[in-house]
């Protein structure tokens, strides 16, 4: 998967890198799931839409919101950020680049007003909108680096370290992970949704991936109090949703590369909802002026949602999370105005094995890892009896002849984890104790060169069913109607 950067010559020079967990002979990957038909809203539903930025609520769930209003179903829309750091908006709307923090704050206020007008086009009153005000383009960094004793993050353009908007849900809230999590848990517990429409974990925009991750943790924390089904919607993905422009007769379908590992559903959007959705998008004037051709392809006769199929691993079990045997994940050039770049080059797969007291991850490269390049593995654990802010958040950086382990940028002893390169094979082993003996594990792999980030996988979730001697807290089931895939008992590839 790729981050939002223009693809450079340096990145192109590394197009030989491919990540394939050493699981070619492991258990079958999480099975591809065809779109499992349509779902319908019904009596008793309560709809919560979690949008990373103003306009995402329309792109991902505009039809849902319109139908819910027509049926008298309660709705609430929550915006993670004000979208105040989109420099293209300044160039096209203000006809000049942003140079001062106050200009970014002004843009955030404008985008909030646009969201109110867009909601009115869908029939949603302003009283049902909540704006959190966290930093645009910054929330994935908060997820990775800003918990507990770590200082708050700083807004990219606003330069703020706390929510700077007086109209936000909690003005002055520090830009830290536990603050975002607390806000989401408060709002979810207050509204008690039955369905949550949220951004997708495979989305290439960092705020979109981050909002899904925070939402997952919030729902786990609220297990037993709130039972809601997640409906993640995809927005930023290479060469998807296809041709630009208004295509009201062509249905959305999942990217072929995301069929495996996700359970997809769709719902129909009627002509009246299509018209309302388009009108709502035009209300986001700062975005419409420069990217109407990117927004319109989401106005279709259906809306599409696909959640992670979460595998369960028992000791000795292994699973492939991704598989692309014919190399369809080859990189592509940047494909939109925001600099949405290519996939992780030639990504074939990602696999995980659970040993009795450690988790083992291996990666295969087409060629040995070039000098100056690195592969980084993130592993964040979750368990219900420890605040997530206090859980280790490990990042293992693997270079051709060395590795280092950090927890929120703090260097940790090498005994915290083990990693090595052997020709085209990369491998890492992390003791469960280093992860505080989690019940669930977030995993991600990234590649980088000296001058430019190259790419990243989605964040994946694995449930760990450890042996009694190492398992600290058993969790059976989830409030989010998760689908799980069993992993076979096989030997580690190394």
PLM features per residue range, with description:
Residues 11-25:
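Bacterial N-terminal signal peptides
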Residues 357-367, 426-430:
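Short, well-ordered beta-strand segments enriched in hydrophobic/aromatic residues
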Residues 31-33, 140-152, 158-173, 183-186, ...:
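C-terminal accessory domains and tails appended to enzymatic cores
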Residues 1-14:
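Bacterial N-terminal signal peptides that target proteins for export
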